[in-house]
Regions:
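Short beta-strands within extracellular/lumenal beta-sheet-rich domains
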Residues: 394-422, 431-440, 444-449, 495-499
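Loop/turn-rich, solvent-exposed surfaces of beta-rich toroidal or solenoidal domains
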Residues: 235-273
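Conserved small/polar residues in nucleotide/adenosyl-binding loops
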Residues: 519-526
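Surface loop/turn signatures of beta-propeller and other carbohydrate-active proteins
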Residues: 1-23, 41-42, 57-88, 103, ...
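Beta-propeller blade signature
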Residues: 48-54, 114-120, 201-208, 263-268, ...
């Protein structure tokens, strides 16, 4: 079988969200923040870069740790580096832009933009300084967060910012939101109210060729007020990224929906943007009219960008694991930019960067499922859910889908099916001996969905036999079945192989497993094995 690649496209023990892909020479480099597997907060690890030949996206190579949080002067008061970007300067060197933050994001809105430099795209970066004014004063105008960098034919542009809708509330000055901004942003009320438009929103600053010094004052690229504009339903939240397609500027960002990457288009880099649409949602919300209530995954933060690699455009984004926003994995999909500049929303898939569907012959990790839902999946927030629902998780080096319940749908898109095949799954029933129990610190987020309601919706009986229905459409009829019998001869920690012969259609299709029972079931790393 030829080498393939699937989502997530990096090793399954790697968690690099907030992806910024860049092609330099004959390789594409993937930059991002770095989550810890099963971590208790965002971005707990040092920056690691992966790269691949532009002509072989199945072959990703780890370039190692390229920069450590301890190299920044804010460390250890602020321990973590958030979403970065890298740009090639006019001197041929590579410049890394990032912001520091603490546990749960505290301090992430209060600091400056830091800069590091390296002679190569993925070598060892060295701290250079902060973005500053000509007199050496550190630039902290607006909210320095999620910086993105662009060398626009010799002009160095940095895009950054975040946006909440507080200031469009009619009673903003009296409802307590101003106090919230003071706390979040580390500014006085007078400083916040002193901005002509708003302290929030997507911002652009132009730098001198030294890559540090402000050349043109920071300014909004999209007005803060979104009501009665094209951005009203999908306002900017965070995750700025800019690309140039032909003579148009494409601003890619994470919206207030907090599960989708959107784009806006302009003839200019600093004004004139019109909302274009959603590129991808990590719950497929909006794709072919899908509602948020009918999302196909736990949704949550996303951040990424688009890049043309060997003539094909892709969108890079991330998915959530471990029932939180703290262990996010890089994924990618092909996209198509129409002649009129429009980008249709794409669905999340398992095949991702693969040049076509996955071969229906071999063993695949269960955790490459692109759809995982029990019909009432939660939306992530700045916390970890402790109630039970289907999720991708790990125990040591074992990575699997846990807490599968009656009606859970597990989807894989797409396979090149070739008719009748043996289809099998590696499974075990969940017990106290093998259950994943989170034992780290737990932060309560008021935005987190009601855990008691989720618990009631996921109240399951245990030790009941079940089976997987096999389907090729989300709501279609079963074309096969794999029974998962209970056996006292098998230890609670042992995985069991169950299989059956299935008459698949001879064409490209999704494969869905739907569990039938009220038991907990875990699907092992090698959940599916399709053999012609």
């Amino acid at each position: 079988m030829n080498r393939q690649v699937y989502n997530p496209f990096l090793p399954l023990n790697e968690y690099i969200p907030d992806g910024e892909p860049h092609v330099w020479g004959d390789r594409v480099y993937h930059y991002g923040s770095h989550d810890k597997e099963g971590g208790y907060t965002f971005c707990m690890q040092d920056y690691v870069v992966y790269s691949a030949p532009v002509k072989d996206l199945t072959s990703w190579r780890c370039e190692g740790i390229t920069y450590r949080a301890s190299q920044d002067p804010a460390y250890p008061e602020l321990k973590y580096m958030y979403a970065p970007d890298v740009v090639r300067g006019n001197d041929g060197r590579y410049y890394l832009y990032y912001c520091m933050g603490g546990d749960y994001g505290y301090g992430g809105y209060t600091g400056p933009i830091s800069v590091a430099v390296c002679d190569t795209p993925a070598g060892k970066y060295e701290y250079l300084g902060h973005v500053q004014y000509k007199d050496g004063t550190v630039m902290k105008k607006y909210i320095c967060f999620d910086p993105a960098a662009m060398n626009d034919d010799g002009t160095i542009r940095i895009f950054y910012g975040t946006q909440y809708g507080y200031e469009e509330e009619p009673d903003f000055l009296t409802n307590g939101r101003l106090d919230d901004e003071v706390s979040m942003f580390g500014r006085t009320k007078e400083e916040i109210l002193g901005y002509k438009d708003s302290i929030m929103g997507p911002i652009m600053v132009v730098l001198e060729d030294d890559m540090l010094t402000v050349k043109e004052e920071p300014r909004h690229i999209i007005p803060y007020a979104v009501k009665e504009t094209s951005f009203e339903k999908h306002p900017f939240f965070e995750g700025s990224s800019m690309r140039k397609v032909g003579d148009k500027y494409y601003f890619v960002y994470s919206s207030w929906q907090n599960h989708e990457l959107c784009y806006a288009v302009s003839d200019y880099p600093d004004h004139g943007f019109t909302f274009g649409g959603t590129i991808v949602s990590n719950g497929d919300v909006g794709y072919k009219g899908r509602s948020f209530e009918n999302k196909l995954n736990m949704t949550g933060t996303t951040h990424g960008s688009i890049e043309c690699i060997d003539g094909q455009w892709y969108v890079f984004y991330h998915r959530l694991t471990h029932k939180s926003d703290y262990s996010r994995q890089a994924c990618a999909e092909k996209i198509y930019i129409a002649a009129d500049g429009h980008i249709d929303q794409v669905e999340v898939t398992s095949c991702g960067l693969n040049d076509g569907p996955l071969v229906a012959n071999g063993t695949y990790p269960a955790v490459i499922a692109c759809n995982l839902t029990n019909g009432h999946m939660p939306h992530g927030s700045n916390s970890i859910y402790t109630t039970e629902f289907p999720n991708v998780t790990n125990k040591g080096e074992d990575r699997f889908i846990a807490e599968i319940e009656d009606g859970t749908l597990i989807g894989y898109k797409y396979f090149a099916l070739e008719g009748s095949s043996t289809f099998g799954v590696n499974v075990r029933y969940e017990t106290d001996a093998n259950k994943v129990v989170y034992e780290g610190p737990v932060r309560v987020d008021e935005r987190c969905e009601n855990q008691e309601q989720l618990k009631d919706a996921n109240d399951l009986a245990e030790n009941v036999e079940g089976y997987f229905d096999i389907c090729v459409t989300e709501d279609g009829e079963s074309i096969g079945r794999i029974d998962i019998p209970v056996s006292e001869d098998i230890s609670e920690t042992e995985w069991r192989w169950c299989e059956n012969r299935v008459d698949f259609p001879e064409r490209v299709h999704a494969v869905y497993l739907v569990f039938v029972s009220y038991t907990h079931l875990r699907a092992h790393e090698t959940l599916s094995d399709l053999v012609c």
